[in-house]
Amino acid sequence: MNAKNLSQNSKQARAKSGLIAAALLVWILVPTGAQAILGIGEPAPSFSLVSGDNKKLTLDRLRGKIVVLFYATRDTVQVNDDLQNYLDTLYATQPKNIQNQIFRLLVVNAMEATSLTTWKENLIKTSAKLKITIYGDWTGDMFAAYRMRDNDSNFIIIDKRGIVRFAASGRIDNSRFEAIKKLLLELAT
């Protein structure tokens, strides 16, 4: 090998190590899970959930409906209350034909439930209070398949064909509510 080839190989190695260092830096600086939630256009993975009163629900049963999914841990269920209230009002003001196309799905990560009976009782009470069935992800299968962010509020819209049309985690700013409304109404018509 001559000096020219060694110099070229050395430059390539430095460039490669620079790229690796940059990728590692991005990985370190990006909050855990920020890049992980499902992407727009991806097929929604199947799921199987159970409510506090043992009602079972699967994605297959929701085909043909727009799924508005809120997934949170016990400590983060209130993070997106403003968005939930906004969407509840939007839903209530829509004609029946639009309401029938939208399924509002509230899921709580229940993987760490120490007392299933207590958790289920609380899900039943909260479901009655909110007038909507809340489901538990008892096994963590949905959490893993949907690449949910841990200890955060996750919000996903799935279209009638089972394709993810919106996905975000953390608090969703009020400035995005109108765009979410527009998307939902477009999907329903």
Regions found by a protein language model. Give the residues of each.
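N-terminal secretory signal peptides that target proteins for export/translocation
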Residues: 1-14
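A short beta-strand-turn-helix
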Residues: 48-66
